[in-house]
């Protein structure tokens, strides 16, 4: 469980290192020139020495897998800067035992962590900035004489167990080619070709007056394995070296084994039924034709000339039954001549019953003349016909009669009032 976590940390350190390298190149204007590391002086000397000790190969590093016997100066002089494509091992590229950029970065990361754990009081901002620069950017080897012997021993002491720790998953014989192939997969995600060429160019000595610009390193929190897996999948991963890989349980011993079966051929042959015998001898009567089925239905007319009746009914064949010859005649009846009354009622046919000679007389009712008011108001109502002769005028007539009654002709309002009263009384039946 410790190895996958260490590989994820190195991949993150690679990404941060290339980001810082691009920032330094943009600030110092060194995009077209090879990578240069500023000189370390002042209070930053222990950190620079530690970084030099980390990157300087010594005699004790011969036991480490990826260490060259020559000095880095000789390596830079003898070998020109070449671009090595990703996914190739050191033996295929023809470099020999020269450590590549990814192995140096991985070694720097592990050494820096172990040194920081072993030492106390190394938590200042300058040490963090310088540790980040040595971890990510300074991958160029320096001569052996630059580092003090005391620090060289500590760097080698910390580097040997980090480099020679055997992996429990890979055999010891095939650890270094597999590691170089795996480390080559953790190249820069942006430009995979340029960091290799920069790491193999010799560093030029920088003037001591120029001080490196301190860059604050922001440590990102550790990412989850799912995010790192998604980020690692986007980078071009070379094909792993499967020649020296051994399975855990020996499942590759029968790798070329081909399982049996699968060679069954289904052949369709016609069945030979010539010699087949029936189970119960049913072929003995195979040509038997069952009887029946040959009945012909013939339609012939029935001869009824010689047919005799059952009970001698032909003797009365011409017999006509009686009845049915009744004729309904319509004759006009003469009642006057032939009809007589039952009880002699025609004797009194001219009799006129008594009564019925009364006359209904129609008399005109003189109700208005005889009408009187219910309440006696002391005046007599005299009614006269409204027809008045032309020679007489209303003024000529007296308004009051001799008896003192009011004349209805002179006052039309009283006349209308009397008419209304008489009409209402007539309706009431008085």
Curated annotation (Swiss-Prot):
Tau/MAP repeat segments: 233-263, 264-294, 295-325, 326-357
One GO-annotated biological process of the protein: hibernation
Membrane disposition: Peripheral membrane protein
Residues with PTM N-acetylalanine: 2
Modified residues (Phosphothreonine): 56, 58, 98, 142, 158, 164-165, 170, 194, 201, 206, 220, 392, 416
Taxonomic superkingdom: Eukaryota
N6,N6-dimethyllysine, modified sites: 152, 300
Positions where Phosphoserine occurs in the chain: 33, 48, 180, 184, 187-188, 191, 203, 224, 226, 251, 274, 278, 282, 294, 313, 341, 345, 385, 389, 393, 398, 405, 411
Main subcellular location: cytoplasm
Region named Disordered: 1-245, 387-406
Sites of N6-methyllysine modification: 248
Cellular component aspect of the GO annotation: axon; cytoplasm; cytosol; dendrite; microtubule; plasma membrane
Segment forming the signal sequence: none
InterPro entries documented for this protein: MAP2/MAP4/Tau (IPR027324), MAP_tubulin-bd_rpt (IPR001084), Tau (IPR002955)
Subcellular location: Cytoplasm, Cytosol; Cell membrane; Cytoplasm, Cytoskeleton; Cell projection, Axon
Disulfide bonds listed in the record: 280-311
Residue positions where Omega-N-methylarginine is found in the record: 144, 338
Ranges of biased composition (kind: Polar residues): 48-58, 390-406
Site of covalent link Glycyl lysine isopeptide (Lys-Gly) (interchain with G-Cter in ubiquitin): 31, 243, 248, 256, 270, 287, 300, 306, 310, 320, 332, 336, 342, 358, 364, 374
Function (record text): Promotes microtubule assembly and stability, and might be involved in the establishment and maintenance of neuronal polarity. The C-terminus binds axonal microtubules while the N-terminus binds neural plasma membrane components, suggesting that tau functions as a linker protein between both. Axonal polarity is predetermined by tau localization (in the neuronal cell) in the domain of the cell body defined by the centrosome. The short isoforms allow plasticity of the cytoskeleton whereas the longer isoforms may preferentially play a role in its stabilization.
Quaternary state and interactors: Interacts with MARK1, MARK2, MARK3 and MARK4. Interacts with SQSTM1 when polyubiquitinated. Interacts with PSMC2 through SQSTM1. Interacts with FKBP4. Binds to CSNK1D. Interacts with SGK1. Interacts with PIN1. Interacts with LRRK2. Interacts with LRP1, leading to endocytosis; this interaction is reduced in the presence of LRPAP1/RAP.
Written domain comment of the UniProt record: The tau/MAP repeat binds to tubulin.
Name assigned to this protein: Microtubule-associated protein tau
Organism: Spermophilus citellus (European ground squirrel)
